[in-house]
Amino acid sequence: MFSIAMKMLFHDRAKFVGLVLGVAFSTLLINQQLGIFIGLISRAGAVVVDVPEADIWVMDPGVKNLDTIFPLRDTELGRVRGVPGVAWAVPLFKSNVTIRTGNGELEASLLIGVDDTTLIGLPPQILMGNIDDLRRPDAVAVSEEGFRKVWRGQPISLGNVAELNDRRAVVVAIVKDSPKFTSSITFFTRYSQALQYTNNGRNQMSFIVAKGAGDQTPEAVSANITARTGLKAMSSPAFRWKAIEYVIHNTGIPISIGTVVALGILVGIAVVGLMFNLFVLENLKQFAVLKAIGTSNLRLIGMVFLQAAVVGFVGFSVGLFGATMFFETAGKSPTFQGFFLPWYVAAGSGAVAAAIIVLAALFAMRRVLFVDPAIVFRG
């Protein structure tokens, strides 16, 4: 009986292809949009990811995200270092600056000031150069994508000179940093050098990054810092998630992408449900013949679900392959770094595809169960 079900399914190739494309389109749209969404919001906490040595971030109590910063007083660093449970604490500077590109154009960029002594705050992956050269006057490191955008068409090299806020900056290292949400150009320099580039006032320390001592958890040390200093202290994962939550709650990105995903699901249900119903309707006489020769309703239900399962499996595979190829191809572009297809998104889209197929099968099932075997002998 199941071989008969397959022959019925593959006999009408046009409807089979239409059913497969309906599931594939829905799967592709869900995976592509959710993959982009996760890649976008992940960029919100990129600065935290680039400081893997620290597991605690300390900031002004009013800070809500990584982009709206209220500077701390220099004396706060000593207070944090004196809190029991803190192994070390160093300053971190973050600010937006204007850079003049190689062709004379102005670009907005991100400037990160790392600790002068330890250089904590610099991304761990150095593509070119020596990080010790950052201790030279006017020395900066630049992200790989930032170099390509500032010096378009030039091979990656050291020694290039840029103007940050009309001050001289010499590239001594190329680093691989995490893609940022607001800027694709990121410069790194010593904390003291960063203050010279910006000169934003007396208090310029954006954050204090710290490491917990002993066997104490970052959450426990953070609570201790907050209790003793009055500053806001959070573990690195918590602060990164807070930055992501800010983007989710204060931008239109979730609504925009969520609408597209919902439309993809609704279109999938409508197209697959309608076409599968038409497929069953056109094969109603075949089901009537099977019923006339004694095939049970349970066996007929199994045949319909087998047909639906084959359509769902093929359609989901095609859609998932298309989404994977999209991210593989688009990921080669420097501006699309950090976007990927998480396994849980693929698994979730599989569940959605299965739900679409089950709904389509249930919608068509009534015709099969109540078909009159006598129609075989009519007209």
Mark where each language-model region is.
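The feature marks short, hydrophobic/small-residue-biased sequence motifs that occur predominantly
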Residues: 74-83, 87-136, 165, 188-191
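Basic-flanked hydrophobic alpha-helices used for secretion and membrane insertion
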Residues: 121-124, 130, 142-237
